[in-house]
Regions:
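Short hydrophobic core segments
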Residues: 1-3, 45-47, 144-153, 270
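Mid-to-C-terminal Rossmann-like scaffold of FAD/NAD(P)H-dependent oxidoreductases
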Residues: 88, 101-108, 112-113, 124, ...
Length: 296
């Protein structure tokens, strides 16, 4: 359970430029370590359409970038980023260049990136639930820039595992439904290193599956019980209320710093919003209908 902390390469000519090309993982890690890069006056191009790409773009604005462009090969409507993230990026001055597929990186005589060539796209057949892009009959476009940030996803470090005989397929470790690694008896894997980057809840679920099967592999059959009594949850005195939306700081102010962009709830709003809880832990919901289990 090692997560996915390595960057993914886009695989185009010029990506190996000595300066002017970096990854979202590298950039955001530096910010997290309080080693803020200086983008003052720079033109930044971000490649990608997910939440991480929006984080990179909005962070670039806060680091002083003069212009930030987000390049995505599909439509803006097809972006995997949350709509509020895309709206927030645009409100803070980022340009979204949709239907533009990166082709190669332009470099100068010093091997520094000075621009990104993109090929205009058009929407084609629907595959996997969303329209696929295809090359449009238009000329390539050069986007001049000082820095290109690749934000197309994360991967895992597999080399050391492969060297020790662990089966790796398409960048992830192959594991059985029991979480045991194929042909490696007694070794288990789960989370992002098996599924690829996913949600926290999927990683937690994988951990629970692995724990149960490791327990059985070791010859035990432990059972976990809960003696916590959950108080009755009644709705007799509850008045139905609408959702309280969180207020945002003005884009012109929030883009100047890394402080929270939301104001948060007032005491009154917090009390009202918490009163809307459906108490799924008590009653259960959907496939979990029936409430909390006493033993598992």
């Amino acid at each position: 359970s090692i997560g996915a902390h390595a960057d993914k390469k886009i695989g185009i000519d010029g990506e190996d430029a000595t300066t002017g090309v970096t990854s979202a993982v590298e950039m955001l890690r530096a910010i997290g370590d309080d080693e803020m890069p200086d983008y003052t006056g720079k033109r930044v191009v971000v490649i990608g359409g997910g939440n991480v790409a929006m984080d990179v773009a909005r962070s670039s604005v806060r680091l002083g970038a003069d212009k930030v462009s987000i390049v995505y090969r599909r439509r803006k409507a097809d972006m995997t980023a949350l709509p509020e993230e895309v709206e927030g990026a645009e409100a803070e001055g980022c340009d979204v260049l949709e239907l533009m597929s990166p082709v190669r990186i332009e470099k100068d005589e010093n091997d520094a990136a000075v621009g990104l060539w993109v090929q205009p796209q058009m929407i084609s057949r629907i595959k996997g639930g969303r329209p696929s892009p295809k090359t449009a009959a238009k000329d390539e476009v050069l986007i001049p820039c000082d820095l290109i940030v690749v934000a197309i996803g994360q991967g895992i470090e597999t080399r050391y595992f492969e060297e020790h005989g662990v089966t790796v397929k398409r960048g992830t470790i192959e594991a059985l439904d029991t979480s045991e690694i194929k042909e490696r008896k007694g070794i288990f894997a789960g989370g992002d290193c098996v599924t690829g980057p996913a949600t926290v809840i999927r990683a937690i679920a994988a951990g629970k599956v692995a724990a149960a099967n490791i327990d059985e592999y070791l010859g035990y059959h432990h059972e976990i019980t809960s003696d916590v009594e959950i108080p009755y949850a009644g709705y007799e005195d509850k008045v139905p209320c609408g959702r309280v939306e969180v207020a945002l700081r003005d884009a012109a102010d929030r883009k100047k710093d890394f402080e929270p962009i939301e104001y948060g709830f007032s005491c009154e709003e917090a009390c009202q919003e918490s009163g809307r809880c459906l108490r799924c832990d008590h009653f259960g919901f959907g496939s979990f209908r029936g409430g909390r289990e006493k033993q598992w």
